[in-house]
Amino acid sequence: MSLPVTLPLIDHLALRVRDERRSRTFYERALEPFGVEVVESSRGPGFAIEGGGDFWIEEGEPPAAPVHVAFAAADRATVDKFHRAAVEAGGRDNGAPGLRPHYHAGYYAAFVIDPDGNNVEAVFHGDRQLPAT
């Protein structure tokens, strides 16, 4: 089954972080391969992503349980660059770039734990085919 390309389901996401400066540095570097633009607001920095789906961080007490957020990459090279940049920015490797066929054919992703313990993923869906059920 192929998924249609439509508007993003999520318009924006705000993530609470313990140390805004540390997290801003991490996300600026980790998301650089996506070509994000850093924007300022009264609540904290945001990362504008072409096509929608803005991502914001704001200082405060993070949720008790870690969050998993995935950023859609245009290709495998972007996934690779994200992983390298995120680890160099202080993230902890949580899954090197590679195929994850147990999700679906063509699912190419990398995972990094951010400074607050959240699981941050970059994913390229390839042909975007889902497994038959």
What are these language model-derived features?
Residues 3-4, 47-88:
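Long, continuous compositionally biased terminal/linker segments
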Residues 119:
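Glycine-rich acetyl-CoA-binding "A-motif" of GNAT/NAT acetyltransferases
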Residues 38, 94-96, 113-116, 124-127, ...:
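Ligand-binding pocket scaffold of soluble enzyme catalytic domains
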Residues 46-49, 102-103, 128:
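Short secondary-structure capping/turn micro-motifs that flank functional sites
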Residues 1-24, 69, 126-133:
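N-terminal beta-strand motif that seeds the catalytic metal site of vicinal oxygen chelate
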Residues 17-22, 70-116:
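Vicinal oxygen chelate
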Residues 58, 104-105, 111, 122-129:
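Short beta->alpha transition motifs characteristic of CBS
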Residues 14-54:
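Core segments of cupin and vicinal oxygen chelate
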